[in-house]
Amino acid sequence: QTLRALFQYKPQNIDELMINAGDLIYVNPAQQSDASEGWVIGTSHRTKSEKEPNVKLNGEAHNLSMSRSATNALSLQNAALRRAVLVMRHGERVDQVFGRSWLQQCLTADGKYYRADLNFPSSLPRQKDGMKQFECDPPLSCCGIFQSRLIGEALLDQEVTVSYVYSSPALRCVQTAQHVLQGLKLNPKVRIRVEPGLFEWTKWEASRAIPNFMTTAELLEASYNIDTSYRAHFPLSSLVPTESYEDYVSRSSAVIKQITSACPSKAPLPPFFAFPGVPGVILIVAHSSSLASLTRPLAGLPSRDSRDFAQMVRKIPSLGMCFCEEQKEENKWQMVNPPVKTLTHGANTAFDWRNTILGD
Amino acid sequence: QTLRALFQYKPQNIDELMINAGDLIYVNPAQQSDASEGWVIGTSHRTKSEKEPNVKLNGEAHNLSMSRSATNALSLQNAALRRAVLVMRHGERVDQVFGRSWLQQCLTADGKYYRADLNFPSSLPRQKDGMKQFECDPPLSCCGIFQSRLIGEALLDQEVTVSYVYSSPALRCVQTAQHVLQGLKLNPKVRIRVEPGLFEWTKWEASRAIPNFMTTAELLEASYNIDTSYRAHFPLSSLVPTESYEDYVSRSSAVIKQITSACPSKAPLPPFFAFPGVPGVILIVAHSSSLASLTRPLAGLPSRDSRDFAQMVRKIPSLGMCFCEEQKEENKWQMVNPPVKTLTHGANTAFDWRNTILGD
C-alpha cells in the first residue's frame, strides 16, 4: 500500500523519519505487528541524493527506479483520529481602505454604482434591500480577492485537503471562502456552510442592529457556492446587538465545539495521508477576533481579558491564520504552525498626477 | 461608415457631442464638406432614454432598432495626428516589502530558492550569473503582479488600444509590462521593446555598477514577450553609474523624443476610434522618476529642481501613471487624466500567531 503524505512531519526520535508533504510512503500491512501503538512502519520512496534534498515526489515520480530511491525504516505517529481546524480572517474589506463613506464615493448622481478607484470591486451583488445595506456589510476590495485567492493557491501547493468550509454570514467572509476554494480548485466541490454563530463580536460590528446579510438565495444568485442543506447552530435571529464580552466568548466556544463535533473524527488510515476517508482540514473563515475566540477554547486555554482582547485583535492582518490539530487523545487540540506561510505586502497610496507631476 | 469611440469626449461647445468609450458613431463621408477643419460630422447610435443615460453600446447594441436610438449632429475634433503616451511605474518590488536582504530570507541552507512569505514570487527566472544578480535587479512581488494585471484589465474595460509597449530593462518593469499586456489580452500580440535608456537615474539605482539585467535570450526563455527586432536607442553599454541629474534629465528627454518619433503619427481616420491605422497608446513601463522625466519634456515643461525631484518621486505609488495626448498641432503634447483610475490599497502586516494568539 503506497500512501501520499499530506503534511510535513519533523522527526523527534532517531527511529522517526522526515516527511515532506507529497512524499510517497510504502506501508506493508504484514510488518505492523512490530510497530508500537499509534505508529506504523513504512518506506519512503523519496530520493536521498545530496543534490536534491528537497525533491518532492508526485504521481510521476512514483515510477522512479528503486535504485534512485532510498529505503528508510519509518515510524509514523498514528493519528487515525487526527483532525485539523484552520481559522482565517477575511481579506481586505473596502471600508478598511476607503473609510465608512466608501459607498458614497462610488455612486453616480442618479445612484448607480461605479468604480471610483480600481481597488473597488467591479460590481456589487444584488441585495433585496438595495446597495445601502453594503455599508453595514461591506464586500472585499480587489486586493482582498487577490489575497484570498493567493492563500487558496498556497494551500493547494502544500496539498492541504480541505473537507469542510464554514463562514461567518458577513459578505466579506463568504467571498473570502469562495476565493480560497477557487485557489484550492475545490469550487464547487466543497460548499460553504454559512454559520451566523461565527459573526464578529456584535459590540464591535453591530452596535445598533445586526446587519441585513445577504440571504442564501441572494448568495446563490450571485454565484456563491453555498451549502443549502446546512442548518445553522446559531440562527441569525439568535444574534443580538451589543452583546457582552462574556456572551461573545461563550457563543464562540459553543460554535467551535458544535462545528468540530459535526465533522467526522473516525477514519481508517494513518495520519498525514490525503486519502478518501481521512479527515481533511475544517476551514473556518471569520473575523480577526475569531482567531483567538475559536482556537483558545479548542486548545483548552482560558479566554483573554476583554481589554487585552481588543489590542490583540488589532494586530491580526487580512488572511491571518491559526491552525489547531487534534492530538492522539480525541478532542484534545493543540495550536501548531499553519500549513502555509504568512502574506505580507505594502500599501499603495492615492496619487494625484496633477499636483505631484505638473505642480511646480 | 460606423466607428467605435476609443475614449470619452466631453463637449466643450453646443454643437459638440458627449461621447463615451464604446459608442458607435455613424460618419457619412459625403457630409464632411460642412465640417470645420479638424472636425467631422456624425450620428451617435446611443440611446438617449432618460432611464439609461450611461448605457454603453457594443457590437450587439449595433443592431438596436433606430427608434430606440437618438440622432445627433456631431462634431468631433479631428486629431488624425493625435497620439497618446501612457507612462507607468512598475508594480510592488520584493525589496520594497522585505528589504535589501530579501534574497537571503528566501534561500535554504544549500542555496535553493523558497518562498519565505506568500508575497514572494513562486519561483525566480534563470539568470546566467545566478540568483545573486536579482539582488540588484529585484522581481515583482505577488502583490506587484496583481497590481499590474488589474491595471491591464482596467485599460481593457476602458477599451484603450495599446499599440506599442516600451520597458526599462529592469526585470520588475518587463514583468509589469507583461502582466499589463496579459490583463489587456494583448499578450503575445504586442511585444515588449526593452529600452535601456528608460532605466532609473543611475545615481539612485546603480551607484557602483549597472545591474546585470537579464538578457533578451533569458527573458524569452522565461516566457517574456520581447520584441527581438527592436534596436535600442540607448544601448546598455551607454549607461554609466552615478550619472549627474543633468545627464539623467537629458537622457530621459532624448529617449522620449526618440520613442515618439519612432511610433507613426499619421493616420487616415478621425480621433477616438479604435480602428487599424489609428495610432493607439504608446505604453512606457519604467520607474517613479520616469513619470516626471519623460512627460515634462514632452509637454514642454522645464525639468524639476534636483532636490524637489527626489521629494516628488517618493510620492509616486506602484502603477502610478501619467498620460500625455498629442494636440492638433503635431508634436505638441498635453498632460491629461489617464484613461483609468488610481489603485489604492492597504498594507498587510507580518503576523506571528504564537505571540499574538497564544501569548498571555
Can you name each region flagged by the protein language model?
Chain A
Residues 1-65, 69:
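Src homology 3 (SH3)-mediated interaction modules
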Residues 9, 68, 76-189, 249-252:
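Active-site-proximal alpha-helix that buttresses catalytic centers in soluble enzyme cores
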Residues 10, 14, 24-32, 36, ...:
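Short amphipathic alpha-helices and their capping/turn residues within compact interaction modules
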